[in-house]
């Protein structure tokens, strides 16, 4: 919950109870500010600056690997489950080399080759090819991490069963996996890959969020901490890897003309939930390895 929301609740509680022992804080602005500043800093301490929060995909000589985006066809899919290296969905074939580039970076991880070789490695692909109008963002705006919060049976392990929102009840808020991600210096394990064919469209922040239930909103939002975080704008046609606890944001089109953007994201690590109202089913019948939630995640 944001500090400003806590302040509103505090003042409302004081109004309901004129004899509240903390009523003195309403008139003592310095003490009031001191308390909430301390709360803010305590929450901010869970956002740890880490160079391993994201990285560019690079060649052996250290140069960034450039991505050759295919001719656009208007694809618009979100978190579609695919068998990495195996699925043969015709309209995704032009993106095969980009997908393969990401997967091969993971094959040094223990157990990855076996999953890949046996066709048991499920990833989640997002491709959006669309016009972005001036002042608009193509993807989700606002500073956030991919890992949301959930309750009940959603954590710590998925039960691979379709459930409704009642699964959220009767438990504390906890972080849900949305790709996880670890960096070992020479290779990545799990995580998320992202690229775009336009400049100034996404910003990544070199931090990892710990104890996200103390910091983010239920959708991973971090907007209230923006003033204390600095980031890097992604370069176009360049693949980036990051974790589901890495802050990032989609940026608006700041030109005076519409731009046609191709956005690519591949989640190669485990996820805890898959939202049927927001995500794209696989036409070949591949199922997500996660709890399937049939309700709107924003309700």
Feature locations, PLM:
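N-terminal auxiliary "cap/dimerization" subdomain that precedes the catalytic jelly-roll/cupin core
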Residues: 1-120
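A generic structural signal for short, non-catalytic loop/turn and secondary-structure boundary residues
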Residues: 1, 17, 120, 136, ...
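Intrinsically disordered, low-complexity cationic segments
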Residues: 19, 28, 143, 218, ...
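Short His-Asn-centered micro-motif
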Residues: 128, 143, 195-197, 242-245, ...
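Hydrophobic alpha-helical segments and helix pairs
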Residues: 91-170
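Catalytic core of Fe(II)/2-oxoglutarate
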Residues: 220-299
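Catalytic core of non-heme Fe(II) oxygenases with the double-stranded beta-helix
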Residues: 136-235, 274-277
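Exposed regions on extracellular, virion, or secretory-pathway luminal proteins
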Residues: 2, 19, 135-140, 230, ...
């Amino acid at each position: 919950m944001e500090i400003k929301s806590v302040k509103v609740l505090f003042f409302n509680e004081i109004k309901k109870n004129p004899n509240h022992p903390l009523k003195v804080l309403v008139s003592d602005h310095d003490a009031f500010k001191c308390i909430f500043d301390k709360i803010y800093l305590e929450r901010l301490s869970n956002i740890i600056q880490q160079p391993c929060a994201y990285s560019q995909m690079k060649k052996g000589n250290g140069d960034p690997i450039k991505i050759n985006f295919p001719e656009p066809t208007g694809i618009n899919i979100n978190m579609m489950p695919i068998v990495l290296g195996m699925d043969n969905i015709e309209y995704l074939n032009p993106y095969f080399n980009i997908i393969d580039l990401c997967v091969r970076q993971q094959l040094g991880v223990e157990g990855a080759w076996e999953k890949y070789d046996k066709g048991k490695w499920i990833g989640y692909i997002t491709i959006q090819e669309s016009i972005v109008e001036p002042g608009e963002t193509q993807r989700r705006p606002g500073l956030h991490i991919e890992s949301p919060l959930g309750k009940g049976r959603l954590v710590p392990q998925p039960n691979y069963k379709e459930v409704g929102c009642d699964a959220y009840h009767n438990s504390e808020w906890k972080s849900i996996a949305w790709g996880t991600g670890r960096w070992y210096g020479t290779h990545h394990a799990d995580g998320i890959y992202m690229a775009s064919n336009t400049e100034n469209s996404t910003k990544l922040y070199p931090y990892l969020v710990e104890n996200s239930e103390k910091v983010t909103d239920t959708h991973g939002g971090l907007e209230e901490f923006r003033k204390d975080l600095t980031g890097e704008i992604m370069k176009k046609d360049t693949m980036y890897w990051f974790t589901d606890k890495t802050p990032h944001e989609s940026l608006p089109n700041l030109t005076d003309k519409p731009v046609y953007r191709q956005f690519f994201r591949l989640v190669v690590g485990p996820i805890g939930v898959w939202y049927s109202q927001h995500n794209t089913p696989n036409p070949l019948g591949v199922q997500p390895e996660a709890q399937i939630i049939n309700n709107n995640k924003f309700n």
